[in-house]
Amino acid sequence: MAGVGEGDSGGVERDDIGMVAASPVASRVNGKVDADVVGRFATCCRALGIAVYQRKRPPDLAAARSGFAALTRVAHDQCDAWTGLAAAGDQSIGVLEAASRTATTAGVLQRQVELADNALGFLYDTGLYLRFRATGPDDFHLAYAAALASTGGPEEFAKANHVVSGITERRAGWRAARWLAVVINYRAERWSDVVKLLTPMVNDPDLDEAFSHAAKITLGTALARLGMFAPALSYLEEPDGPVAVAAVDGALAKALVLRAHVDEESASEVLQDLYAAHPENEQVEQALSDTSFGIVTTTAGRIEARTDPWDPATEPGAEDFVDPAAHERKAALLHEAELQLAEFIGLDEVKRQVSRLKSSVAMELVRKQRGLTVAQRTHHLVFAGPPGTGKTTIARVVAKIYCGLGLLKRENIREVHRADLIGQHIGETEAKTNAIIDSALDGVLFLDEAYALVATGAKNDFGLVAIDTLLARMENDRDRLVVIIAGYRADLDKFLDTNEGLRSRFTRNIDFPSYTSHELVEIAHKMAEQRDSVFEQSALHDLEALFAKLAAESTPDTNGISRRSLDIAGNGRFVRNIVERSEEEREFRLDHSEHAGSGEFSDEELMTITADDVGRSVEPLLRGLGLSVRA
């Protein structure tokens, strides 16, 4: 393919990106530019206020536009004529297409009238926050691509991408071309490609302030549209900057990400400030008045599954999308769940219950696939037991099983407590609860200490509103939501009695017993091993004696209810605290030993936790829990 100024192609030249351009013949005679064309070009340039033959006059844009429009009719093959028309204010897609098409002649007329380098050019809108100046062939191609992308049609996106791809292949590091690639993919809602393009660019120290601001807001928005809210927020946290439109878009995106994170209070603050500054912005007004207004998310897989890569309308919805890697991922999830379940120390009955649960769901789905009658079953669960007995971890295992079997689309688990659901004002609780449930859809909502929702016993407790909202959503989203409630058995029974609809939806119970002292010692040994630590034997004996005493004693909890002291300590959670605190005691002991500063410690010394380390760690832990152990 002939490049710029290369070869002859029988009356048709091809520029460096493969676009067909008419040969410059109409305004040339025997290879020379027609003198009349040169004279008219000089007159038009003066009307733009550009120095011609080192002389200039005040600009007259109307005259320049009229003159260049007439010039393009007689010199339609001259890029400089089209560039002048764009500089005079006509940046219609036809003009920009012509400038791109005739780009191989750029500079021909300018040299005839001795224009300074880059004197003739125009600013064009990229279609997303930034404007670039076009003075040369590749600039004109980008300006045309931007105009194509601004029309918003799949065919135009494809054409624009073809134009820009030809440039980036030759000039991979040119930021202007990379930004146009971002713009095209942004407008076509190809968010994963926007992220790929911007990630290596966004922290470039050579970016000017406006470019850096635009890049961060665009990347944050793309990440949010992919449902990657935490990384999105890192780019949207400070949305202000030199690009005013980007600052508004960034603040709105930040608010909606906070809403997706179920931080409605912070989202509302951002929206209120934004609305005060921009009351004319309809999206901001809608987001402020409607708490269900949020970010529409997709996935890279769904984007790639489009029948037309540039048409968002051909993208499969979440319900219709079949991930080609889903089968392998589901099998991996089931295997992972089995391994995690097998690694648990104790909890034999819990393991059996979870295994039966898996079998029940698996066979239910098989019967459904065969067209056999399937009894309407609820998949919501009650996990009853004291703190630290593995309820949250088993909930994650159940989420993997449900997802691996295809009952749920995600293995995500959203763990919440009363404070996450309850608001301070009328209407706030319903909004917060709905937002929490929205974030848990297609996964598991894990409500720990569920009884706290109604612990006050007051008829006007907002917790009752949260329960009503939860029940309604469990019915309306029964195919997309699994709820697991957790807490002490007696407390959960009281909770289930507060609303007649709860018992019928939570029919499957799994009881989590307190660990035995021997099991807790096993847990301590395993935790230490995973951290490259080891308890000396006497330390393990002391731990078992401690756990046995705590298991035999009772202590009132914060509500005055007598509980096993070991349950108040937190069972497995208490063990983790002991391991971590004992390691700190070991480090302190070694740092104050005779070898401190020399580093002359054996691996055994660096790993061993002694009985004294344990003893010094346990006392402050028990004191912090309000517990004591009788001798």
Swiss-Prot record:
Q: Where does it localize?
A: Cytoplasm
The Gene Ontology biological process terms listed for this entry are: cellular response to iron ion starvation; intracellular iron ion homeostasis; intracellular zinc ion homeostasis; siderophore-dependent iron import into cell
Q: Does the keyword ATP-binding apply?
A: yes
Under SUPFAM superfamilies, the record lists: P-loop containing nucleoside triphosphate hydrolases
- Membrane-crossing residues? none
Q: Which InterPro entries match?
A: AAA+_ATPase, AAA_lid_6, ATPase_AAA_core, CbxX/CfxQ, CbxX/CfxQ_RuBisCO_ESX, P-loop_NTPase, T7SS_EccA, T7SS_EccA1-like_N
GO CC: one term? Answer: peptidoglycan-based cell wall
Question: Which keywords does this Swiss-Prot/TrEMBL entry list?
Answer: ATP-binding, Cytoplasm, Nucleotide-binding
Q: Which CDD domains match?
A: AAA
Instruction: Give the Gene Ontology MF terms in alphabetical order.
Output: ATP binding; ATP hydrolysis activity
Residues given in the record as ATP binding sites:
385-392
UniProt key word Glycoprotein: no
Q: What is its main location?
A: cytoplasm
Q: Which conditions up-regulate this protein?
A: Repressed by IdeR in the presence of iron and by Zur in the presence of zinc.
Its family remark reads: Belongs to the CbxX/CfxQ family.
| Subunit organization | Part of the ESX-3 / type VII secretion system (T7SS), which is composed of cytosolic and membrane components.
- Protein's job: Part of the ESX-3 specialized secretion system, which is important for iron and zinc uptake or homeostasis. EccA3 exhibits ATPase activity and may provide energy for the export of ESX-3 substrates.
Q: What is this protein called?
A: ESX-3 secretion system protein EccA3
Native organism: Mycobacterium tuberculosis (strain ATCC 25618 / H37Rv)
